[in-house]
């Protein structure tokens, strides 16, 4: 399931993030890649233990906390602190898969299962050429290049890549979540059912037996599938 979520950050919030990142120290992005992924990775990142990464990570987590679409799509149990990357001057990240298990920084070794990947764009498409996020699934390849402040959410099990940036610079935040429902097919069904419930409520109101029955069905499925 690949879901685009608009306006996770407002234009003012994007500008604030950009201003903080512009004056920060960037390092070789390969320091956070696995052995295989590092062979195809060429980008810059903000060190995860830096003050700006921690500040802006909390800033983005706060924005996620008020975004109902993200919670409906990801059903997050735990979210790793957001990270920040930059591609420019031919930088790219070849096709790779994310590590299934990731260590939470600053916890002394606590680990989470990476079920859901997210990329939050911090530059508009007209600011750079190339830099498309290409996500592969059973139905083919999907190319994603969204306005600043918009986000794409997709299964962490997907093969994906970032095409070379040939003009300008592509800035983004990226992070992973452990979902309450680890199976992507089950998450997709719950997400689509949630959307259906919202539409039925809009059309019929909340005082109909059909609405209550659908809500009951949603929560019983979540109760059956969730792992806490």
From Swiss-Prot:
GO biological process, alphabetically ordered: DNA damage response; intracellular iron ion homeostasis
UniProt-listed Enzyme Commission number(s): 1.14.11.-
Protein name as annotated: PKHD-type hydroxylase Rmet_0838
Keyword annotations from UniProtKB, A to Z: Dioxygenase, Iron, Metal-binding, Oxidoreductase, Vitamin C
Cofactor: Fe(2+); L-ascorbate
NCBIfam families: PRK05467.1-3 (NF003974), PRK05467.1-4 (NF003975)
Residue intervals of the Fe2OG dioxygenase domain: 78-179
Oxidoreductase is among the record's keywords: yes
Entry-linked InterPro entries: Oxoglu/Fe-dep_dioxygenase_dom, PKHD_C, PKHD_hydroxylase, Pro_4_hyd_alph, Pro_4_hyd_alph_FE2OG_OXY
Binding site for 2-oxoglutarate: 170
Annotated Fe cation binding sites: 96, 98, 160
Cofactor mode of binding and number, as noted: Binds 1 Fe(2+) ion per subunit.
Species of origin: Cupriavidus metallidurans (strain ATCC 43123 / DSM 2839 / NBRC 102507 / CH34)
Example of a GO MF term: iron ion binding
């Amino acid at each position: 399931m690949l879901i685009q979520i608009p306006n996770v950050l407002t234009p003012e919030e994007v500008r604030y993030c950009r201003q903080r990142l512009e004056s920060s120290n960037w390092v070789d992005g390969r320091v956070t890649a696995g052995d295989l992924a590092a062979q195809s990775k060429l980008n810059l990142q903000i060190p995860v233990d830096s003050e700006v990464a921690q500040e802006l990570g909390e800033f983005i987590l706060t924005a996620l906390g008020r975004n109902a679409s993200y919670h409906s799509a990801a059903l997050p149990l735990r979210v790793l602190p957001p990270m920040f990357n930059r591609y420019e001057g031919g930088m790219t990240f070849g096709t790779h898969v994310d590590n299934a298990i990731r260590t939470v920084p600053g916890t002394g070794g606590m680990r989470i299962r990476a079920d859901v990947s997210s990329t939050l764009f911090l530059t508009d498409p007209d600011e750079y050429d190339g830099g498309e996020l290409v996500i592969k699934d059973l139905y083919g390849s999907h190319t994603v290049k969204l306005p600043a402040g918009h986000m794409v959410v997709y299964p962490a099990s997907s093969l994906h890549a970032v095409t070379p940036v040939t003009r300008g610079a592509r800035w983004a935040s990226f992070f992973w979540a452990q979902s309450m429902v680890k199976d992507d097919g089950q998450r997709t069904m719950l997400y689509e059912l949630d959307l259906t419930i919202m539409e039925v409520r809009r059309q019929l109101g909340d005082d109909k037996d059909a609405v209550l029955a659908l809500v009951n069905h949603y929560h019983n499925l979540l109760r059956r599938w969730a792992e806490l």
